[in-house]
């Protein structure tokens, strides 16, 4: 087999003609195998050229993939799987990315936590769970989870106040239960004392709910019984 021509293409790759067949090769491949016009190559060398060029092709696709935003190792491996890259070659690409600074666990964790703080109301425990699912080590996560410490109470109060404004029918007792569940699902833990001390007068809500239930029951029962049944229903609602 013989290389008959090598021409630089507009996309930065080289069009290499070998025995009248054209191949798009990366500069890395050209330099690694010292390819030049009229060079003779055997089948083994040809196979290695194609194999390595496929490796570089996957590598540069991943470079483009990580240039859009920071990626986790899991995300990169999933992308490499879609490109049908073998495990050993995946490991080589991952190591190369780490060496060149494209893949940095601590940088990703810090950036992820800052985004969650600035763009969401998620709490530290949920953020920690999500990062663990992405394959990060707990000790690395804990280094930056402390970013929540000074703002935790402020964020909890913000969520509670938002829920208070939207509450039109819950008693204080049921409100505390519901919002407590919401806060726990959002990843907060130290919220109980804050919730217990909220300024919440549910008298108006009680009266509104009483009137709504009573007006339905009075159509079926005498006033005294309607009153008793109404209060029983309100009791089950935490009033």
Which residues does each predicted region cover?
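An alpha-helical, amphipathic repeat domain used for nucleic-acid recognition
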Residues: 1-239
């Amino acid at each position: 087999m013989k290389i008959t021509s090598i021409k630089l293409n507009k996309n930065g790759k080289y069009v290499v003609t070998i025995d009248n067949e054209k191949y798009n090769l990366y500069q890395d491949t050209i330099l690694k195998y010292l390819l030049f016009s009229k060079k003779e190559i055997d089948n083994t060398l040809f196979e290695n050229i194609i194999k390595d060029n496929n490796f570089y092709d996957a590598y540069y696709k991943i470079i483009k993939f990580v240039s859009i935003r920071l990626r986790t190792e899991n995300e990169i491996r999933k992308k490499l799987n879609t490109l049908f890259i073998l495990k050993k070659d995946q490991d080589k690409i991952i190591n190369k990315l780490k060496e060149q600074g494209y893949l940095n666990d601590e940088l990703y964790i810090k950036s992820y936590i800052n985004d969650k703080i600035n763009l969401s109301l998620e709490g530290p425990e949920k953020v920690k769970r999500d990062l663990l699912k992405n394959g990060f080590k707990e000790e690395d996560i804990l280094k930056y989870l402390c970013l929540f410490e000074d703002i935790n109470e402020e964020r909890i109060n913000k969520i509670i106040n938002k829920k208070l404004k939207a509450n039109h029918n819950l008693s204080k007792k049921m409100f505390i239960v519901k919002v407590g569940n919401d806060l726990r699902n959002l990843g907060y833990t130290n919220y109980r004392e804050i919730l217990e001390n909220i300024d919440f007068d549910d008298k108006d809500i009680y009266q509104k709910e009483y009137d709504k239930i009573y007006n339905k029951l009075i159509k079926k029962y005498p006033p005294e019984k309607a009153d008793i049944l109404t209060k029983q229903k309100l009791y089950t609602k935490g009033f």
